[in-house]
C-alpha cells in the first residue's frame, strides 16, 4: 500500500466497502457492540473478505484520534479519484455540474459540501489550494462516505481555472446575496460551475469578476444568509430539478 488513510465511522467505511473493498487493509471494530447496525456491518465486511480486528474503545480512540468513531475505524489505501481537472472533464458524459468553493476552510463545512455534491450528482468539488482545507479525518467523517466518491480538486489559481472552464464551454455561475437575478430564473441545464463563497465573506473580488453571471437565493425569513453547505444544496438541486424536467410535447 503506497499511501494510506484512516476511515472513521460507519458511513465512511461502508462507502469504501461498496466502492472498493480491496483497497481496505484492515478494519478495527468495537468488540463489545452487539447491536443490529454493527452486526450488519460485520457481515458485509466479512463477505468482502476484509481483515477484521476486534478492539476496545480505548484502542479505537487512539487509532482514530477522536471519541467520535462509532466503533468502526479502517486503514485503507488513499484513492485518487481524478488526476486533474482536464482528465475529469474529458471523462464526463453529458453537461458537467461542478461545485466551486472559494474560501471554505472549515472541515465540517467541506465535509457537508462533499455530501451534498454526492447527493446531487455533481462531478467534482474544486477549491483553491491557499484558501481551502484538505480531506482530513473530520472532513471524511462529516462527508459520510462522499469523500470516497466525489473528486476534490485543488488548484493554484482559481480565477485562471474558472477562465479555463469557460474556454471549455462551462458557464460559471457565482452566488451573491445582492445579485439581482433569482436562482430560480437562472438556466442550469447546460455545463455549469457553481461558485460558492465563504459564509459571511462571499467570493473574493477576482473570483466574482470572473463569473459569467451572479444569482441570489430568495430569502423569505429574517436570516440574511445560509450555511455554505445548505446554500450549495439549494443551488445544486435546482440544477438537478431543471435537468430532470421533461419538456412538454
UniProtKB/Swiss-Prot annotation:
Keywords: Cytoplasm, Methyltransferase, rRNA processing, S-adenosyl-L-methionine, Transferase. One of its GO terms (cellular component) is cytosol. Transmembrane segments: none annotated. Signal peptide: none annotated. It comes from the Bacteria. It catalyses: guanosine(2251) in 23S rRNA + S-adenosyl-L-methionine = 2'-O-methylguanosine(2251) in 23S rRNA + S-adenosyl-L-homocysteine + H(+). S-adenosyl-L-methionine binds at residues 197, 217, 226. Pfam families: SpoU_methylase, SpoU_sub_bind. Its EC number is 2.1.1.185. SUPFAM superfamilies: alpha/beta knot (SSF75217), L30e-like (SSF55315). InterPro entries: 23S_rRNA_MeTrfase_RlmB, Alpha/beta_knot_MTases, Ribosomal_eL30-like_sf, rRNA_MeTrfase_TrmH, SpoU_MeTrfase, SpoU_subst-bd, tRNA_m1G_MTases_N. The keyword Cytoplasm applies. The keyword Transferase applies. It is found in: Cytoplasm. GO terms for molecular function: RNA binding; rRNA (guanosine-2'-O-)-methyltransferase activity. Specifically methylates the ribose of guanosine 2251 in 23S rRNA. Belongs to the class IV-like SAM-binding methyltransferase superfamily. RNA methyltransferase TrmH family. RlmB subfamily. This is 23S rRNA (guanosine-2'-O-)-methyltransferase RlmB. It comes from Ralstonia nicotianae (strain ATCC BAA-1114 / GMI1000) (Ralstonia solanacearum). The gene is rlmB.
